Every structure is written in C-alpha cells, then in structure tokens.
C-alpha cells in the first residue's frame, strides 16, 4: 500500500546501511520496481532516487530495478485450466506473453531518461504463466500442469529477454519446482520434466553469448481477436566465443508450418545442429507418460548458398546451432 515516492524514500534510507564488506563480493542492490504496466511507479521511484543529494556516480543508489509480470493474473481469481483450454485461450495467453516486450520497452524508456548508460539492470523478478491449480491439490501450493502453451510462453519471453539484454540483466521464472510454471514436477520419488524445462535447456546457449542483430521478413499477425493478435514467428540470435551462432525460433500458429530461409551475413553453414520441441497445444508430460513432449533432433532443413532453408512445424520451439 505504499506510494512510489514514499517507497523510494524508504529505499534510500535503508540501502544506506547495506554496506559492502568484501570488495571481491560486492553487494548488488535491487530496488523494488513496478508490477506489470505501472509506469508511474518506475518514473517516480527513479526520480526520487536520483534526486539531489544523490551523487551521479551512485546511479540512484541501485544496481537493479525490478519488474513483476505474470501471464494469467489479469483473469482474476479464476484464471482457467492449465490443460483444458481452447484456441481462443491459446492466443489470449500468447498475446499476454508477447506484451513483455512492450513492458520492457516502456519501462526501459523511463530508465533511459535517468540512466542512459544502462548501469542499472532491469530485473524481471517473477514471470511465467499463472493458471488454476490442478483439481484435488492444495490451492495454496499453486501446483499446476504445464503444456506446449507454457513452452511457447517461455520461448517467446526468453527471446524477448535475449533481444533486450542490454537492459535486462536478470530474469527469474516462478517457480522452478511444483509451483506455477515449473520446469520440474515431483511426486514422492518420481520427477518429470515439463515442456518448459526443455525450452530452458534449448535456450541455455544464449547465456554468456553475445546478441546478434536479427530480423524477420514476411511475419504475419495471427489470432482470433484484434486485441490479441500475435506474430506467427518470433526469434532471437546470439554468437558464442567459439563463433557458433544460436538461433531460437517460435512458431505461434496452431495449424500452419512456416517455410523459412535463414540468411547469414559473413558466415557459412559448415556445421549445423538442431533440436525441436513440438506437439499439440494441450500436450503435457505426466509421471506415467514423462516424455510425451520432449526435445528431439531436427533434420528438416537444407543448406543454401546464403544459409539454411527449413520448415518450422506449427506449435513449436526450434534451436539451430550453426558453426
């Protein structure tokens, strides 16, 4: 129930006494930022934290400013089943996942006014899908299943984070095990990897790599309502220290595969490795069927003089590694 200016004053007060006692382990101070599209909070908190007598080198007395955003909370108390949903809810969910880019752009534009050198990292403290709990489970435990809809939400969101890595310095899915959009579900001694787990496994190659500028031509908007239209394909690209390019692609369509040509500048496809996560929109893994949805080798591509040509299946996440 705090106002942003009151919170900012408290933050300035308390951060004063969070001191660094080990120069080899510096304290990383994160200021509590906005929930979703509360842009006023971001603006007022930064204004008050940068206000004199704050020295310029203190960059607002913070190293990070958080943003908090879940897909699904906009539905209120009854958010809908994690596994029983229709095509309309598919596009509704993915449109809210795509909104992460707008949030980063608009919060980032405010941060740029106070911190043009981007010394303050945007910290997405919690993100992911929030559905209704599984029937028969404790509502307070927030245990939910995890389908290809969640996998695409993860792929979309991680691509957005990668493309904005100049500002986004940390992003935490909530949670990792048994809660909300978890990467692992457990039951006694048994464990199952969710579709989201495989997306994280595929996207690990972006971590520690350098962003590569990329763009898509011929992207179409798809959906069932004007306000919920999403791009049919979405991407991000990076290159590691050994010169290996990682391309992650998402096909948001439920019915249409996409014929794509990957055009590389100053690079030839000497070696290609690819894996795919694909399935029906309601497909998920259980303890009895733990590998119904899993990452598999992908071979439906051909080398060309300019790069690669491929068919991207509907409802899929693809990783390409080009050496």
State what each model feature region is.
Residues 4-155, 218-227:
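Noncatalytic carbohydrate-binding groove/subsite architecture in carbohydrate-active enzymes
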Residues 98-101, 105, 152-159, 194-198, ...:
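Feature representing long, continuous alpha-helical segments
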Residues 120-235:
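Aromatic/acidic polysaccharide-binding cleft in carbohydrate-active enzymes
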Residues 161, 171, 200, 247, ...:
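Hydrophobic, well-ordered secondary-structure elements that form the walls
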Residues 215-219, 225-230, 250-323:
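C-terminal beta-sandwich/jelly-roll accessory domains of carbohydrate-active enzymes
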Residues 235-237, 301:
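A structural signal for short hydrophobic beta-strand segments in well-ordered beta-sheet cores
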Residues 243-251:
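Short, well-ordered beta-strand segments enriched in hydrophobic/aromatic residues
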